[in-house]
Amino acid sequence: MADGGNRRNVTGEVTKPGVSSRHSLIQYEHAATETCTLMDFMGYGPHIRQARRDAYKTVDRLMTALMCGSATCFTTGSKAEGLTCFLESDIDVMCVDNNVICIEEGVDSSNILKETTILRACSQKSYPGHCILLLERSGTTITTFVHNALCDDGYDHELLSSALYINAWLNFKRTEGAVILDRVGPSTPSTYYGGTLHQDLVHALHLYCPSILTRWAARPRNWPTNNIVQKVVSLGTVVTPVGFKGSDYEHVEWRLCFNAGENVLVNNLTDIMVKVYVLLKMVKQDVLKPRKKEVTSFTVKNIVLWIAEKTPQSLLHERSLFQWLHEGLYALRVAIDTKELPYYMIPERNLMAACALEHEQKLSWIATINDMIEEGPIMILRLPKIRRALIAHPEPLRWYSGRRIEMEMLELIAMNRGALDMDEDTDVIMVAVLTRKADIMKEVRDRMITEGCRENNLHDLYHSMLL
C-alpha cells in the first residue's frame, strides 16, 4: 500500500514496507506504466485477449451444435480468458449433459420434463462445495454413462458414483489420432497431433442451486457490477466428477463448479487486474514451481477475484500495477502460511484444505515471496518471459510481437474453419491463411538468420511462435 507504513499479516509479522517517499512512488508508477506497455506487446493486451475469447466462443457454439441438444460444450480456463497463446497451455473444455438435472435439497422437481433424469444433491456429509447425488427419477432419455454409474448406497437408494462416471468416459473412444492420458481430477486429458495440442475435457452435469448463488449475489461488494452479478447467477452451476481428497465418500462425491460464471468474472476484470493475474500466474509457475499442485492457477485466480471485489475500481489503474501485485503476493503468502483461502463462489470451501504442502516448502516459499515484495518493481526480472521481453524491447519486441500475434490470429481462424470441416486445399479462406502463415515464418526466419541465429527449421519456429 502507498501509505508509508508497514503491513502485518494474520500472525502479526511485519511483512512489507509501504512506499516511503514521493520519489519512490513516481518510480513505482513509471515502472508500472512501462510494464503494462511491455505486457501488451507480449500478447496480454485487451484487443488480443478479446480476439482469443471470441475465437473459442465460436468453437464452443460449433461443438454444442454438433451435440444436437444432448450436451452443451464450452471452453474454460486460460483459453476462455484470452490469456494464453494457441499452444501455450492445455485447452480446457467442459461438456455438460443436458439430459440430467441435479437440484439442491428443498427445490421442487415436479415441473421438470419427464425426459430429464433428476438427481438430488445432498451435502450434509460432504465438505463444503461438494455433494452426493441421489437418483430421484430416471428420465426417458438417459445416457449409458449415467446409467452405468448408478450404484446402491446400502439404504435402498441409488446414487451416482463420480468414480464410475469418469472411468466410463476414460474408456470412451475419442477422435482418431487422440491419445488418452491418465485422469487428472475431474478431467479426462488427451493429446492430438503427436502431442502438440493438449486438451483437458471435463464431463459435467447441470446443478440448480439457487441458495448458493443467492448468497453469493447478496454479498456487499465494489465489483462486479449488478448486471455482471446477475449474468453470473443466470449461468448457473455444474457438478464435476471428483470428490474431496481424503473423504470417506470421495468415490461418490461431486464438486460444485461455476466455470461459465468465472469466465465472465475474469473477462470483466479491469485491465490492470488481468495483468496482476498474469504476473501472479508467472510467479506460481516460474518462481514457486509447485510439484504437487500445492498452489495452482485457480488459487491465484481466487486471490485476484477477492482483491477486485473488495477494492474501489477507481484505484485499479495502470500506475498502480505494482501496488496490486504486492497485494496479490501478500495474499498468496498468507494463504501458504495459514493454508487457508476461501473459494470466491463458496467461501466455506477452503481451497488450501487438501493442499499437500510440506513445512520446509512452505517456509521456502514464504521467504521467496517476502524477498519479491521487498524488491519492488525489479521483482519482475525473476520472471523469464518478462526478462526475455525486456531484453528485446522496444524495436525487436515490437516487430516480433506483431508477427506472433498475427500468426496466432491466423491459427485461430484456421481452428474455426477446421471446426466447420472446411478443406485446407479448397477453402479460399484456409488457403489464404496457410499462405500468410508461411510468409510470416519466412520473414521471422530471415530476420533470425540476419541477426546471427542458425536455427532455420520452420516447424520448430512455428511451434515456438505459438507457445
Predicted regions located by residue number:
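Non-catalytic helical "accessory" subdomain of NTase-fold nucleotidyltransferases
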Residues: 1-467
